[in-house]
Amino acid sequence: VMSTEMGAPISWARSAQAWAGQVHIEATIKAAEEMVWEYSRGTTRIIYEGIGVCSLITPWNWPMNQIACKVAPALVAGCTMVLKPSEIAPLSGTLFAQVCHDAGVPPGVFNLVHGLGPEVGARMSVHPEVDMVSFTGSTRAGTQIAAAAAPTAKRVAQEMGGKSPNIILPTANIAEAVAAGVNAVMANTGQSCDAPTRMLVPRNRQAQALKVAKEVAEAIKVGDPREVATVMGPLV
Protein backbone atom coordinates (compact mmCIF):
# COMPACT_ATOMS: atom_id res chain seq x y z
CA VAL A 1 0.00 0.00 0.00
CA MET A 2 2.71 2.50 0.97
CA SER A 3 4.76 1.71 -2.10
CA THR A 4 1.70 2.19 -4.30
CA GLU A 5 0.63 5.51 -2.87
CA MET A 6 3.94 7.37 -2.55
CA GLY A 7 6.48 5.46 -4.60
CA ALA A 8 8.79 3.95 -1.99
CA PRO A 9 10.56 0.89 -3.45
CA ILE A 10 8.86 -2.24 -2.17
CA SER A 11 11.96 -3.48 -0.33
CA TRP A 12 12.21 -0.18 1.56
CA ALA A 13 8.47 -0.08 2.22
CA ARG A 14 8.59 -3.54 3.78
CA SER A 15 11.78 -3.09 5.79
CA ALA A 16 11.50 0.54 6.90
CA GLN A 17 8.06 2.04 6.28
CA ALA A 18 6.04 -0.81 7.80
CA TRP A 19 8.62 -1.48 10.52
CA ALA A 20 8.72 2.13 11.72
CA GLY A 21 4.97 2.33 12.28
CA GLN A 22 4.95 -0.93 14.23
CA VAL A 23 7.91 0.13 16.37
CA HIS A 24 6.25 3.41 17.34
CA ILE A 25 3.09 1.61 18.39
CA GLU A 26 5.10 -0.87 20.46
CA ALA A 27 7.10 1.95 22.07
CA THR A 28 3.90 3.80 22.94
CA ILE A 29 2.45 0.73 24.62
CA LYS A 30 5.65 0.19 26.61
CA ALA A 31 5.74 3.84 27.71
CA ALA A 32 2.10 3.68 28.78
CA GLU A 33 2.74 0.55 30.86
CA GLU A 34 5.64 2.23 32.65
CA MET A 35 4.06 5.64 33.11
CA VAL A 36 2.67 6.68 36.49
CA TRP A 37 -0.59 8.43 35.62
CA GLU A 38 -1.46 9.62 39.12
CA TYR A 39 0.73 10.26 42.15
CA SER A 40 1.27 12.59 45.11
CA ARG A 41 4.04 15.15 45.51
CA GLY A 42 3.93 16.53 49.02
CA THR A 43 0.41 17.88 49.50
CA THR A 44 -0.19 18.05 45.74
CA ARG A 45 -1.93 15.36 43.68
CA ILE A 46 -0.59 14.99 40.11
CA ILE A 47 -3.03 13.51 37.58
CA TYR A 48 -2.28 13.05 33.89
CA GLU A 49 -5.29 12.91 31.60
CA GLY A 50 -6.09 13.18 27.91
CA ILE A 51 -6.24 16.68 26.49
CA GLY A 52 -9.47 16.05 24.59
CA VAL A 53 -10.24 16.16 20.88
CA CYS A 54 -7.15 16.02 18.67
CA SER A 55 -6.78 16.96 15.01
CA LEU A 56 -4.05 14.81 13.47
CA ILE A 57 -2.67 15.85 10.08
CA THR A 58 -0.06 13.56 8.52
CA PRO A 59 2.23 13.81 5.47
CA TRP A 60 2.61 11.60 2.43
CA ASN A 61 6.29 10.60 2.67
CA TRP A 62 6.03 8.26 5.68
CA PRO A 63 2.28 7.64 5.68
CA MET A 64 1.78 4.71 8.06
CA ASN A 65 4.64 5.69 10.36
CA GLN A 66 3.30 9.20 10.88
CA ILE A 67 -0.22 7.90 11.49
CA ALA A 68 1.10 5.49 14.14
CA CYS A 69 3.18 8.25 15.77
CA LYS A 70 0.11 10.42 16.28
CA VAL A 71 -2.77 7.99 16.78
CA ALA A 72 -1.11 5.59 19.25
CA PRO A 73 -0.28 8.22 21.93
CA ALA A 74 -3.71 9.81 21.54
CA LEU A 75 -5.44 6.47 22.07
CA VAL A 76 -3.29 5.65 25.10
CA ALA A 77 -4.05 9.04 26.65
CA GLY A 78 -7.78 8.52 26.20
CA CYS A 79 -8.30 11.21 23.57
CA THR A 80 -10.73 11.21 20.70
CA MET A 81 -9.29 12.21 17.35
CA VAL A 82 -9.84 13.10 13.73
CA LEU A 83 -7.09 11.97 11.35
CA LYS A 84 -6.54 13.63 7.99
CA PRO A 85 -3.85 11.86 5.99
CA SER A 86 -2.26 13.59 3.05
CA GLU A 87 -4.50 13.78 0.02
CA ILE A 88 -1.48 12.58 -1.98
CA ALA A 89 -1.21 9.34 0.00
CA PRO A 90 -4.64 8.47 1.46
CA LEU A 91 -4.49 4.66 1.31
CA SER A 92 -2.60 4.03 4.55
CA GLY A 93 -5.10 6.11 6.50
CA THR A 94 -8.01 4.15 5.08
CA LEU A 95 -6.29 0.87 5.91
CA PHE A 96 -5.48 2.07 9.44
CA ALA A 97 -9.13 2.99 9.98
CA GLN A 98 -10.12 -0.56 9.08
CA VAL A 99 -7.52 -1.92 11.51
CA CYS A 100 -8.94 0.28 14.29
CA HIS A 101 -12.45 -0.93 13.51
CA ASP A 102 -11.39 -4.58 13.50
CA ALA A 103 -9.46 -4.07 16.76
CA GLY A 104 -12.60 -2.84 18.51
CA VAL A 105 -11.80 0.85 18.94
CA PRO A 106 -15.12 2.32 20.14
CA PRO A 107 -17.17 4.31 17.61
CA GLY A 108 -16.32 8.01 17.67
CA VAL A 109 -12.88 7.61 19.24
CA PHE A 110 -10.95 7.35 15.97
CA ASN A 111 -12.33 9.26 13.03
CA LEU A 112 -10.92 9.54 9.51
CA VAL A 113 -11.52 12.34 7.04
CA HIS A 114 -10.00 12.81 3.60
CA GLY A 115 -9.56 16.14 1.85
CA LEU A 116 -7.28 18.96 0.84
CA GLY A 117 -5.15 20.73 3.42
CA PRO A 118 -6.31 24.29 2.68
CA GLU A 119 -9.92 23.17 3.09
CA VAL A 120 -10.26 20.24 5.49
CA GLY A 121 -6.97 20.78 7.32
CA ALA A 122 -7.75 24.44 7.84
CA ARG A 123 -11.15 23.62 9.33
CA MET A 124 -9.61 21.04 11.66
CA SER A 125 -7.15 23.68 12.89
CA VAL A 126 -9.66 26.42 13.58
CA HIS A 127 -12.59 24.40 14.94
CA PRO A 128 -13.50 25.60 18.46
CA GLU A 129 -14.16 22.10 19.81
CA VAL A 130 -10.69 20.81 18.92
CA ASP A 131 -8.24 20.95 21.84
CA MET A 132 -4.98 20.08 20.09
CA VAL A 133 -3.54 19.94 16.59
CA SER A 134 -0.63 17.67 15.69
CA PHE A 135 0.84 18.39 12.26
CA THR A 136 3.74 17.04 10.24
CA GLY A 137 4.46 18.63 6.88
CA SER A 138 5.77 21.75 5.22
CA THR A 139 6.82 24.90 7.05
CA ARG A 140 4.39 26.91 4.94
CA ALA A 141 1.40 24.80 5.98
CA GLY A 142 2.60 24.56 9.58
CA THR A 143 2.73 28.31 10.09
CA GLN A 144 -0.80 28.60 8.70
CA ILE A 145 -2.04 25.92 11.09
CA ALA A 146 -0.41 27.63 14.08
CA ALA A 147 -2.05 30.91 13.14
CA ALA A 148 -5.44 29.25 12.68
CA ALA A 149 -5.21 27.52 16.07
CA ALA A 150 -4.08 30.59 18.02
CA PRO A 151 -7.45 32.34 18.53
CA THR A 152 -8.81 29.35 20.45
CA ALA A 153 -5.53 28.74 22.32
CA LYS A 154 -5.19 25.19 21.09
CA ARG A 155 -2.06 23.25 21.85
CA VAL A 156 -0.10 22.75 18.65
CA ALA A 157 2.64 20.16 18.08
CA GLN A 158 4.48 20.36 14.78
CA GLU A 159 7.31 18.78 12.85
CA MET A 160 7.90 21.01 9.85
CA GLY A 161 10.02 19.94 6.93
CA GLY A 162 13.64 20.69 6.34
CA LYS A 163 16.63 18.75 5.13
CA SER A 164 20.05 18.60 6.71
CA PRO A 165 23.54 18.63 5.20
CA ASN A 166 26.27 16.07 5.53
CA ILE A 167 29.20 17.80 7.22
CA ILE A 168 32.39 15.92 6.37
CA LEU A 169 35.44 16.97 8.39
CA PRO A 170 39.02 16.95 7.08
CA THR A 171 39.91 13.92 9.21
CA ALA A 172 37.12 11.77 7.75
CA ASN A 173 37.49 8.99 5.22
CA ILE A 174 36.08 10.93 2.26
CA ALA A 175 35.17 7.90 0.17
CA GLU A 176 33.24 6.20 2.99
CA ALA A 177 31.55 9.38 4.18
CA VAL A 178 30.46 10.52 0.72
CA ALA A 179 29.18 7.06 -0.22
CA ALA A 180 27.16 6.86 3.00
CA GLY A 181 25.70 10.31 2.37
CA VAL A 182 24.67 9.56 -1.21
CA ASN A 183 23.06 6.26 -0.23
CA ALA A 184 21.23 7.97 2.64
CA VAL A 185 19.72 10.65 0.41
CA MET A 186 18.40 8.01 -2.00
CA ALA A 187 16.64 6.01 0.73
CA ASN A 188 12.84 6.20 0.57
CA THR A 189 13.38 7.60 -2.95
CA GLY A 190 14.86 10.71 -1.34
CA GLN A 191 11.52 11.65 0.17
CA SER A 192 12.36 11.88 3.87
CA CYS A 193 12.55 14.96 6.07
CA ASP A 194 16.07 13.98 7.12
CA ALA A 195 17.37 13.26 3.61
CA PRO A 196 20.86 14.81 3.54
CA THR A 197 20.52 16.61 0.21
CA ARG A 198 23.57 18.83 0.76
CA MET A 199 27.15 17.87 1.43
CA LEU A 200 29.76 20.16 2.98
CA VAL A 201 33.33 19.01 2.38
CA PRO A 202 36.76 20.63 2.75
CA ARG A 203 37.48 22.68 -0.36
CA ASN A 204 40.67 20.77 -1.10
CA ARG A 205 38.71 17.46 -1.11
CA GLN A 206 35.87 18.66 -3.33
CA ALA A 207 37.06 16.95 -6.52
CA GLN A 208 37.43 13.61 -4.75
CA ALA A 209 34.02 13.98 -3.13
CA LEU A 210 32.35 14.73 -6.47
CA LYS A 211 34.02 11.71 -8.08
CA VAL A 212 32.85 9.34 -5.35
CA ALA A 213 29.34 10.83 -5.27
CA LYS A 214 29.00 10.38 -9.04
CA GLU A 215 30.15 6.76 -8.92
CA VAL A 216 27.78 5.86 -6.08
CA ALA A 217 24.81 7.66 -7.64
CA GLU A 218 25.31 5.99 -11.01
CA ALA A 219 25.31 2.55 -9.36
CA ILE A 220 21.91 3.07 -7.73
CA LYS A 221 19.10 1.05 -9.30
CA VAL A 222 16.33 3.31 -10.61
CA GLY A 223 13.11 1.64 -11.69
CA ASP A 224 9.71 0.21 -10.90
CA PRO A 225 9.07 0.42 -7.13
CA ARG A 226 7.39 -2.99 -7.29
CA GLU A 227 10.72 -4.64 -8.12
CA VAL A 228 12.76 -5.70 -5.08
CA ALA A 229 16.06 -4.53 -6.60
CA THR A 230 14.85 -0.96 -7.11
CA VAL A 231 16.40 1.66 -4.82
CA MET A 232 15.08 4.84 -6.45
CA GLY A 233 11.43 4.84 -7.51
CA PRO A 234 9.08 7.56 -8.73
CA LEU A 235 8.94 10.93 -6.97
CA VAL A 236 5.76 12.53 -5.66
In which residue ranges do the predicted regions lie?
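Short, structured beta/alpha segment
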Residues: 1-4, 175
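Short linear capping/connector segments at secondary-structure termini
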Residues: 3-9, 39-43, 161, 227-232
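Long amphipathic alpha-helix in the N-terminal Rossmann-like dinucleotide-binding domain
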Residues: 7-35
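An alpha-helix initiation/capping motif
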Residues: 15-19, 23, 118, 230, ...
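Rossmann-like NAD(P) dinucleotide-binding subdomain of oxidoreductase/dehydrogenase enzymes
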Residues: 37-176, 207
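ALDH superfamily catalytic-core signature
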Residues: 132, 140-236
